[in-house]
């Protein structure tokens, strides 16, 4: 898996601040507006899309936002599992790893 070492938002804002501002306003509008898709599901969809592109930072951020909007561990896992059907099963392990400290599960007892 390849993780980019740069923040593309910073590059866009540096090269074309107007484009950066417009993109930020558009993305905030799409995510924040009240619509037929509740915010929790928007965040789950975005998280799954980011997982398919191996964007661990984005997957973690959107997963955290989905949890903040009420998504359960099971909903997070199901969305990531669906993403792995499109992108391969390594997507599932990578994306779970990026969110591992956010899950509320208890560790298995040692036998």
Segments (PLM) and residue ranges:
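Acidic, glycine/proline-rich low-complexity segments that act as flexible tails and inter-domain linkers
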Residues: 1-41, 94-111
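C-terminal structural segments of small proteins and small subunits
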Residues: 77-102
